[in-house]
Regions:
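Catalytic center-proximal scaffold of phosphoryl-transfer enzymes
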Residues: 1-186
Length: 186
């Protein structure tokens, strides 16, 4: 069997070799007006010299285009923390080494690390799946009638999205304004 440390080293070396491809893909993604972002914790063995047999929490940030773009892609960006500076650096926002910075719509959860992006010209677009999850948890754990009613609204919203998924952007927008807005206002 090949030692896990050897496999990890090989993966790291491959990552270094593939970095120009990842950079080109990220640059192409930043030409689109809408991106999705999320982050998830991963265990990371402490660097050489700091090893005491323990791991610490690092994060794998993911950025993807929407299903409506001609190029469907995901870029994963490993970071040693969950700090918002990582998403700002990926988007090339002021205060990072990249400029002038991306100015599209970012679909994300309500994690505070994204908030500085919205103060720097990025438009916040909340993720319906993350919002729905909170209401589902409220309903499932506490029998909340508010949570139950919200879930019924989400069923309606998802049905409208299914109807509109194959339409052109302007047609999707019109349907959303016509059918979704009244539900959101209810």
């Amino acid at each position: 069997a090949i030692a896990r440390s050897t496999l990890a080293q090989w993966v790291g070396e491959c990552g270094v070799q593939l970095q120009p491809l990842v950079d080109a893909l990220a640059a192409e993604m930043l030409s689109y007006r809408v991106l999705h972002a999320d982050e998830t914790p991963v265990a990371m063995l402490k660097p050489a010299g700091q090893r005491d047999g323990k791991t610490h929490r690092a994060y794998l940030w993911s950025y993807c285009t929407t299903g409506f773009n001609p190029m469907r892609a995901v870029v994963f960006d490993f970071a040693d923390s969950r700090g918002g500076q990582h998403v700002r650096a990926f988007l090339g926002l002021p205060g990072t080494e990249h400029k002038p910075g991306w100015k599209g719509k970012l679909v994300s959860d309500d994690f505070s690390g994204y908030k500085a992006c919205f103060e720097l010209g990025v438009t916040e677009a909340g993720c319906m799946a993350h919002a729905r999850r909170k209401f589902h948890k409220l309903w499932a754990n506490h029998g909340s009638t508010v949570g139950e009613q919200a879930l019924k609204f989400f069923i309606q919203l998802y049905e409208i999205e299914r109807e509109a998924k194959d339409l052109a952007a302007d047609e999707r927008k019109a349907i959303r304004q016509d059918k979704t807005q009244p539900i959101a206002d209810a």
